[in-house]
Swiss-Prot record:
Residues 49-76 are annotated as: Disordered. The keyword Cell division does not apply. Belongs to the C-terminally encoded plant signaling peptide (CEP) family. Glycans are attached at residues 37, 48. It comes from Arabidopsis thaliana. This is Precursor of CEP7. The modification Hydroxyproline is found at residues 65, 68, 72. Keywords: Apoplast, Developmental protein, Glycoprotein, Hormone, Hydroxylation, Secreted, Signal. The mature small signaling peptide is generated by proteolytic processing of the longer precursor. The keyword Signal applies. Interacts with CEP receptors (e.g. CEPR1 and CEPR2).
Length: 76
């Protein structure tokens, strides 16, 4: 009787784990047609655009502390 109960308990735990894993895997289906339309529109766009990358000087000397009272605060 104890062996049957232990087997039932292990089986129940396995079933619960599998059910939980199936809930994690569920998700909404992706619509790939919208993505392909966007890529076609982007490819058909103006090909004469030039890409200009700018580099900004981010050194320790560029740091300016904020005066008291002008800080945006936490979360802003």
């Amino acid at each position: 009787m104890a062996k049957c109960t232990l087997t039932s308990l292990i089986l129940l735990l396995i079933v619960l784990v599998l059910i939980q894993e199936s809930h994690i895997v569920e998700g909404r289906p992706l619509k790939s047609s919208r993505i392909s339309n966007v890529s076609k529109k982007f490819a058909a766009g103006n090909s004469n655009l030039s890409s200009k990358l700018t580099t900004e000087d981010h050194s320790l000397d560029a740091f300016r502390p904020t005066n008291p009272g002008n800080s945006p605060g936490i979360g802003h």
